């Protein structure tokens, strides 16, 4: 290339740079299709919950309602401030659902007091409230006050919002026809988020409370700043921080007292038992699509426990399970074709959104005919294929035991008393890292990382 052309390139880039920076943002498709309303919906005990509602401009026919309840804020706030997408996925963009987002009690713009994984209310008190009654009261208000709705409601949510779906599907409102608890918290001690069979999830919990701050004294749309730790090196930071008790001061104000509750209740006591949803998952009326990911380090337990419990305790429920090769919520962020260096041969998340999730809601909320969903749709890693089953766990499944042997081997045969063994030293001053990434965040792809760097220590 001639020298004069090379010299022109920086000049051209300098001229075009400001123009590119000033380029207008693409039109928001939601503003063209929806009108936004913000309302306070009264609950039976007088508390009002802030709800942001997107109403289709098409009034030629009635539309079903999709509801998400969340502790993370329903922003952007203001009736002239619109999301850039509504509903569970982009596949819903042209489906004209009425979509409602609600701040749960004590979070952001809603009134009341926030309680983590709120236990069930006291029976017999008509004014007592819990997440199921709040869901009932919200649905009742929506179907009675929103124009052009067809009287059918669905719910969806991932992680904590998925927990609110699992609680909400117990509300018994006749308009609630279909729900999708996705990576739901079902039992925070047994295997979701807080503890894994009694093992406190330090990095996950501490990182969560760095951003899950207490709000102001009154309802507010403001999102508090994330608490800064001053370093990207989480391994070094936790090593120097010392015992868990020493971390309390760093998150005490931010966590609304939840951190103290977590570390005070280290056994499966009444605190955790009251938050276990499994005993309550009975006689569930709406159709259920439970979704989870095999590589979900936070709530893998919840999805499987939800599906299994519905099978055992609510057999009449039209219940379906989808388990894909995903990290926490990955089916709703990206195409699901890979995690780190692990590739799955197809766009698994895009397929789920278009061919499973959308048809599920369209069938139960719009009466659209669709293929019958199998009881379980499960991705088999290694062979990289979807498999379907008429029961979960599959009827043909058999338990298989693995045994650790010496020299880093694994076997299907129980070792004898005289077989060799390997010994390891557990040194709290030199803990084994789970990832090579220099990061303070909980690394989602660590399950597929090459762990030989740690095994060589």
Language model segments and positions:
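Short glycine-enriched nucleophile-adjacent loop
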Residues: 143, 160-173
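Active-site-adjacent alpha-helix of alpha/beta-hydrolase-fold enzymes
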Residues: 300-319
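Alpha/beta-hydrolase fold nucleophile elbow
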Residues: 147-159
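Short beta-strand/loop motif that positions the catalytic acidic residue
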Residues: 284, 290-292
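Accessory cap/linker subdomain of secreted extracellular hydrolases
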Residues: 75, 82-85, 94, 116-128, ...
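Cap/lid segment of the alpha/beta-hydrolase catalytic domain
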Residues: 60-145, 193-194, 200, 333-344
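C-terminal, loop-rich substrate-recognition/catalytic regions characterized by aromatic stacking residues
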Residues: 229-245, 322, 331, 336-457
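N-terminal cap/lid segment of alpha/beta-hydrolase-fold proteins
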Residues: 24-61
């Amino acid at each position: 290339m001639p020298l004069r052309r090379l010299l022109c390139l920086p000049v051209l880039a300098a001229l075009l740079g400001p123009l590119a920076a000033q380029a207008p943002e693409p039109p928001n498709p939601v503003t063209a299709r929806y009108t936004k309303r913000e309302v306070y919906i009264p609950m039976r005990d007088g508390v009002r919950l802030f709800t942001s509602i997107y109403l289709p401009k098409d009034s030629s026919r009635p539309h079903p309602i999709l509801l998400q309840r969340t502790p993370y804020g329903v922003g952007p706030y203001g009736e002239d401030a619109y999301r850039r997408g509504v509903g569970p996925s982009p596949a819903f963009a042209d489906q004209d659902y009425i979509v409602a987002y609600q701040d749960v009690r004590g979070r952001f713009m809603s009134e009341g007091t926030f309680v983590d994984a709120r236990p069930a209310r006291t029976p017999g008190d008509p004014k007592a409230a819990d997440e199921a009654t709040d869901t009932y009261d919200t649905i009742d208000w929506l179907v009675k006050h929103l124009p052009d709705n067809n009287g059918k409601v669905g719910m969806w949510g991932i992680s904590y919002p998925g927990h609110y779906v699992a609680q909400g599907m117990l509300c018994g409102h006749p308009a609630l026809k279909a729900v999708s608890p996705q990576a739901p918290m079902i039992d925070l001690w047994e295997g979701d988020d807080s503890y894994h069979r009694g093992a406190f999830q330090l990095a996950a919990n501490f990182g969560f409370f760095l951003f899950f701050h207490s709000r102001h004294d009154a309802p507010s749309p403001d999102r508090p700043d994330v608490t800064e730790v001053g370093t990207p090196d989480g391994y070094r930071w936790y090593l120097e921080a010392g015992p868990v008790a020493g971390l309390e001061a760093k998150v005490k104000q931010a966590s609304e007292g939840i951190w103290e509750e977590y570390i005070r209740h280290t056994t499966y006591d009444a605190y955790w038992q009251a938050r276990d949803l499994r005993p309550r998952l009975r006689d569930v009326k709406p159709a259920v699509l439970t979704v989870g990911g095999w590589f979900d380090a936070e709530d893998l337990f919840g999805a499987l426990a939800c599906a299994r419990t519905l099978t055992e305790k609510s057999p009449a429920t039209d219940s379906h399970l989808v388990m894909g090769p995903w990290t926490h919520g990955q089916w709703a962020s990206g195409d699901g074709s890979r995690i780190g260096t692990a590739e799955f041969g197809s766009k698994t998340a895009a397929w789920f959104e278009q061919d499973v999730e959308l048809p599920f809601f369209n069938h139960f909320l719009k009466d659209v005919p669709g293929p019958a969903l199998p009881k379980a749709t499960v991705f088999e890693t290694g062979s990289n294929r979807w498999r379907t089953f008429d029961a979960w766990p599959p009827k043909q499944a058999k338990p298989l035991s693995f045994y650790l042997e010496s020299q880093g081997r694994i076997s299907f045969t129980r070792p004898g008393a005289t077989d060799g063994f390997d010994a390891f030293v557990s040194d709290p001053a030199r803990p084994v890292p789970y990832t090579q990434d220099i990061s303070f965040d909980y690394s989602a792809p660590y399950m597929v990382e090459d762990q030989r760097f740690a095994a060589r220590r």
